[in-house]
């Protein structure tokens, strides 16, 4: 059996990057059941709301208008869940592009900086399957959430 000699460091191979973010803490949230995922986003919103309320209370205008204070605090505290979603989106899009690519761009210290290595056909097929059946649904789910937040 021919063993493929790959110059790409293990940590920079798309399949290993996929496994790495799949096991990371915040980036892996979209892999959870939807109700657990939404609950985590809700908890992040609830966590930051008191901090936002304290910051908003520093305004003389808002201190005298309680309804405005609450509305602005609740709205501004949405920043944390949106940042978390953005981070997840960027990570999954990056992995999706790396898995779909025919070549692997990698960096290695020394004289191999900025190298490109063409994936063998069997690697490409495996990466495409992972991209289409595991990563694409996550991206679509995050896209749906972003579209909902725009309303």
Kindly give the residue locations of the regions a language model identified.
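Membrane-interfacial hairpin junctions
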Residues: 57-69
């Amino acid at each position: 059996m021919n063993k493929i000699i790959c110059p790409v460091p293990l940590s920079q191979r798309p399949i290993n990057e996929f496994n790495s973010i799949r096991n990371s803490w915040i980036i892996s949230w979209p892999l959870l059941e939807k109700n657990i995922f939404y609950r985590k986003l809700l908890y992040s919103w609830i966590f930051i709301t008191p901090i936002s309320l304290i910051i908003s209370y520093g305004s003389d205008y808002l201190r005298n208008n309680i309804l405005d204070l609450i509305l602005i605090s609740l709205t501004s505290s949405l920043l944390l869940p949106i940042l978390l979603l953005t981070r997840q989106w960027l990570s999954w899009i990056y992995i999706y592009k790396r898995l779909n690519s025919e070549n692997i761009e990698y960096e290695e210290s020394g004289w191999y900086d900025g190298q490109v290595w063409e994936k063998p056909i069997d690697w490409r097929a495996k990466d495409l399957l992972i991209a289409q059946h595991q990563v694409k649904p996550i991206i679509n789910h995050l896209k749906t959430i972003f579209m909902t937040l725009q309303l």
